[in-house]
């Protein structure tokens, strides 16, 4: 497969590595971008997958809560520009969609779009909004939480771009909000080690083993190094293993233990995460216009 300059450029942006290192990795993986990144991580050539999880789309994350605070719905609605994201009509639509999710409990986005909202379907209302604001509008995803008996729901919004909802077993509203704020800031992958996907753990172990092998140390030392790195990795990605943002001397797990509470589940949305927006090259655009003039 031919390795193009644009492929090398993308890999450089995602890893922070040099041009020749990127070209070599792409050649060795026959142009497979993800495989090249993994290969470079194993060899230590990749500084970080900088592009992964990059926020690119605009819109809002909104939350609706039932009057008795036992049910919550969180929705992400996307548009093309920050200007429209702040538009009153767009904001009203996003909030009404969250209310429909809360009351109607649709199974998925397709079912949601067919539900009634103020005399028309959500899809029809979306189409009307597109005509009004002049931009594409998409209801991307939603989550609905319902507290079990004796449970507590909490939510937190950081501006209009980040939303977190959490369900606690035990605890109170203040603790739930503190946990939500922590999740917003620290981005845990899951609640605890039991929820870490085995595939993800195996992949990280393989990468850590390849990195440790570069040291040339004996196998038993390498195994200890890998175990230590896995332990640190799990503490970084699990909610209960992370240092609590308001008191870094204790973990979230210890905070919950002291309050006699557990986190059943949480949801964290950030506007546009995982969606890549087209990058405009204004120099090329001006050149094209000049040639056409």
From Swiss-Prot:
It is found in: Cytoplasm. One of its GO terms (molecular function) is translation elongation factor activity. The keyword Heme does not apply. Residues 81-84 are annotated as: Involved in Mg(2+) ion dislocation from EF-Tu. GO terms for cellular component: cytoplasm. It comes from the Bacteria. Gene3D superfamilies: 1.10.286.20, DNA helicase RuvA subunit, C-terminal domain, Elongation factor Ts, dimerisation domain. Keywords: Cytoplasm, Elongation factor, Protein biosynthesis. SUPFAM superfamilies: Elongation factor Ts (EF-Ts), dimerisation domain, UBA-like. Belongs to the EF-Ts family. PANTHER family: ELONGATION FACTOR TS, ELONGATION FACTOR TS, MITOCHONDRIAL. This is Elongation factor Ts. The lineage of its organism: Bacteria, Pseudomonadati, Pseudomonadota, Gammaproteobacteria, Chromatiales. The gene is tsf.
């Amino acid at each position: 497969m031919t390795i193009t300059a644009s492929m090398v450029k993308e890999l450089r942006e995602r890893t922070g590595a040099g041009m020749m290192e990127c070209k070599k990795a792409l050649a060795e993986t026959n142009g497979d971008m993800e495989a090249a990144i993994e290969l470079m991580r194993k060899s230590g050539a990749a500084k970080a997958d900088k592009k992964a999880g990059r926020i690119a789309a605009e819109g809002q994350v909104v939350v609706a809560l039932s009057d008795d605070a036992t049910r919550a719905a969180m929705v992400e609605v996307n548009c093309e520009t920050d200007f429209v994201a702040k538009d009153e009509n767009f904001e009203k639509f996003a909030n009404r969609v969250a209310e429909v999710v809360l009351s109607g409990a649709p199974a998925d986005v397709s079912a949601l779009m067919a539900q009634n909202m103020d005399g028309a379907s959500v899809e029809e209302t979306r189409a009307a909004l597109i005509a009004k604001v002049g931009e594409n509008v998409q209801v991307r995803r939603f989550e609905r939480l319902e507290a079990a008996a004796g449970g507590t729901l909490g939510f937190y919004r950081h501006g209009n771009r980040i939303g977190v909802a959490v369900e606690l077993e035990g605890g109170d509203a203040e603790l739930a909000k503190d946990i939500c704020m922590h999740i917003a800031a620290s981005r845990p992958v899951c609640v605890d080690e039991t929820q870490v996907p085995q595939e993800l753990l195996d992949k990280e172990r393989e990468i850590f083993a390849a990195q440790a092998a570069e040291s040339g140390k004996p196998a038993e030392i390498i195994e200890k190094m890998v175990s230590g790195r896995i332990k640190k990795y799990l503490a970084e990605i699990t909610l209960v293993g992370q240092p609590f943002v308001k008191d870094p001397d204790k973990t979230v797990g210890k905070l919950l233990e002291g309050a006699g509470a557990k986190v059943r589940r949480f949801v964290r949305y950030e506007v546009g995460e995982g969606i890549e927006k087209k990058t405009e090259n204004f120099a090329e655009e001006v050149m094209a216009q000049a040639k056409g003039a």
